[in-house]
Design a protein with these regions (language model features):
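N-terminal helix-rich module
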Residues: 2-10, 23, 29, 34, ...
Length: 211
């Protein structure tokens, strides 16, 4: 009987020492919370960056589609912005009526990404304006201007203040179309740059410079 009791006591003691104490559990929970607090914002930022860059890529692709169609059909086409079913879009205005019609090339901005109202100011959380390396001009066309492509496939500033609208080449400046999103900790910025020769590229703001 005594032998049984001693064995049982040893067994009970073994069970107690093989588990976790409350302090150990609290430490584990604390470590998990710290890691999650660091990782989750980084993950959300990475997802936002992917969506922002995807929208910029889709817009650049749409611009190239407009360029190809303009050269193919020997017609000037402009790229306009609007909404469809509550989503922000950009489209190639094939019939020149200034509104989106079924069958026209279109792209939709993803997530919370929206076209900017114009060139960022460089203050209040906004980046500085993008400057194309090697360009000697003093500024660029931006979201306040309408990008068009002539029948030669060259970009132009589509001017609707004239009747009919004019789109002369070569353009006086290069084009930069900005977009931004809303994310944890602020906003992200990207842009599509179109050179005077019609070449398009994507740039993103990393918090201190465009690259």
């Amino acid at each position: 009987m005594k032998l049984y009791d001693r064995t049982r006591k040893r067994s009970v003691r073994g069970i107690r020492t093989s588990g976790f104490s409350l302090l150990e559990l609290l430490i584990v929970v604390f470590v998990v919370m710290v890691v999650a607090g660091i990782a989750i914002p980084n993950i959300l930022s990475a997802v936002a960056n992917v969506r922002l860059r995807a929208s910029a890529g889709d817009l650049a692709g749409l611009m190239q589609d407009a360029r190809i169609l303009a050269a193919k059909n020997n017609t000037t086409y402009a790229i306009h912005y609007g909404t469809r079913n509550g989503a922000n879009i950009a489209y190639v205005d094939l019939n020149g009526n200034g509104s989106f019609d079924t069958g026209e090339p279109v792209m939709q901005f993803s997530g919370s990404t929206v076209p900017a109202s114009g060139t960022p100011s460089g203050s209040n959380g906004q980046p500085s304006a993008y400057v194309l390396v090697g360009d000697t001009g003093s500024s660029s066309y931006d979201n306040t201007n309408t990008l068009g492509y002539t029948g030669r496939g060259l970009p132009c500033n589509y001017d609707t203040t004239t009747t009919p609208a004019t789109c002369n080449t070569p353009p006086a400046k290069y084009f930069v179309y900005y977009m931004s999103d809303t994310r944890v900790g602020g906003s992200g910025w990207a842009a599509v740059v179109v050179t005077k020769g019609g070449r398009a590229k994507i740039v993103t703001w990393n918090g201190s410079s465009w690259n």
